[in-house]
UniProtKB/Swiss-Prot annotation:
Organism: Danio rerio (Zebrafish)
Family membership: Belongs to the allantoicase family.
EC number: 3.5.3.4
Taxonomic lineage from the root: Eukaryota, Metazoa, Chordata, Craniata, Vertebrata
Record's keyword terms, sorted: Hydrolase, Purine metabolism
Record protein name field: Allantoicase
A Gene Ontology biological process term: allantoin catabolic process
């Protein structure tokens, strides 16, 4: 039977969980070094799917675990690994997930961070279960001087991997771009997942005046800042890399319960329904939008009937105020129609440009509104970034 998420639980979760997981394997994150991977390899830390437990699963090295688990340490020191973020950016928080590690979780952890100008050539290949770092690997990683990286999370006591204690949320206040983190566990043990929540930070200095850029993309600093419903998939999935792998890699809402018993359509073939769902994104850089892509890939029996896109320009203070009010309708921004309501198709890539779009000038935020409900796998907002001077003149 499904477990209902109560409102109290939702409110107690930190806000940074709405941001993007910059280290997820689907975003290009990878573990480039680990001191020890005897029971389970460190690459498992970055899996997108939730951890699982199979009671009967064993390997020749011991109990199979869906995470990173080191051997019981019998030499001086502690275990650690280095994660290369798939999307460099500003980190706002971590989820150190100990799911299913109940008698074997790492009791303490700390995290360090840095921004490297060049990506190191260090890499871990293949299944490393039952292995430890070799002397040559230790020698290579020593060149990174990771022990002197900035400590963004001090040594922190972790909780066991039971359902009510497994998520160890760690907020961060570090306003600098990060490319790599060093994840330290003390002295040894297991961690199921490590999620690095933040916002991508792109160098826009060389982009102005060039080709169109996907202003909302995860890699370009786009971020979801509000939504009405995320029952089956978070809206942030829509700005991920490449095409969606499946429905779970997109945004899907629950079925609205206010749907009419008998559905009717207007002269344009769009269903007349009282309700809708929405998701709001801050663009990675303000810009003038000239093309929009809406992809319902994989959504065949559950795509929205229609979709529209709205846009506006907000200051940081205005955005924070609206987030605090959860974008309530009585304090909503002045949204302008960018893309009028469009009839959607199943499992289809919809592209809109030219006369299909309404010129709104430079904008910083977009709102997708779907009716009555359903799922979309990808959102692309193509445009040309504008300077801060152009935005100020508009405001």
């Amino acid at each position: 039977m499904a477990k209902r998420q109560v409102q109290k639980e939702t409110r107690s979760q930190p806000h940074f969980l709405q941001f993007n997981n910059l280290a997820c394997e689907t975003a290009g994150g990878k573990v480039i070094f680990a001191t020890d991977e005897w029971f389970a390899p460190a690459r498992n830390l970055l899996k997108r799917d939730p951890p699982e437990f199979i009671a009967s699963a064993f390997t020749e090295f011991g109990k199979w675990m869906d995470g990173w688990e080191t051997r019981r340490k019998r030499i001086p020191g502690h275990d650690w690994c280095i994660v290369q973020l798939g999307v460099p950016g500003i980190i706002h928080g971590f989820d150190v997930d100990t799911s299913f590690f109940t008698g074997n979780y790492a009791p303490f952890a700390s995290i360090q961070a840095t921004c490297l100008d060049q990506m190191p050539s260090i890499a871990l290949e293949g299944d490393r279960t039952g292995m430890a770092a070799s002397p040559s690997q230790f020698e290579a990683v020593a060149q990174l001087n990771s022990d002197s990286w900035k400590e963004v999370v001090p040594v922190t006591k972790l909780k066991a991997g039971y359902s009510d204690t497994c998520h160890n949320y760690l907020s961060v206040s570090y306003p600098h771009r990060v490319t790599h983190i060093r994840f330290n566990i003390y002295p040894d043990g297991g961690i199921a997942r490590l999620k690095v929540y933040g916002i991508g930070k792109k160098d826009w200095s060389s982009v102005f005046g060039q080709d169109l850029v996907d202003l909302v993309a995860l890699v370009n600093g786009g971020v979801c800042v509000g939504f009405s419903d995320a029952h089956y998939g978070h809206p942030r999935n829509m700005i991920g890399l490449g095409m969606a792998e499946n429905m779970g890699d997109g945004w899907e809402t629950a079925r609205r319960l206010d749907r009419p018993r008998v559905l009717k359509e207007d002269e344009n073939g769009i269903l007349q329904v009282p309700g809708s769902e929405w998701a709001i994104f801050r663009l990675g850089h303000p810009g003038i939008i000239s093309k929009i892509e809406l992809d319902t890939n994989h959504f065949k029996g559950n795509f929205p009937d229609s979709c529209r896109i709205e846009a506006c320009s907000l200051t940081e203070d205005e955005e924070n105020s609206f987030i605090q009010s959860q974008w309530s309708s009585d304090r909503s921004p002045m949204w302008n129609i960018l893309l009028p309501p469009q009839k959607m198709k199943a499992h289809h890539r919809h592209v809109f440009s030219g006369p299909s779009l309404v010129h709104c000038g430079p904008v910083s935020h977009v709102r997708m509104v779907i009716a009555p409900d359903g799922g979309i796998s990808r959102l692309r907002i193509w445009g040309r970034p504008v300077s801060s001077h152009q935005m100020i003149s508009k405001l």
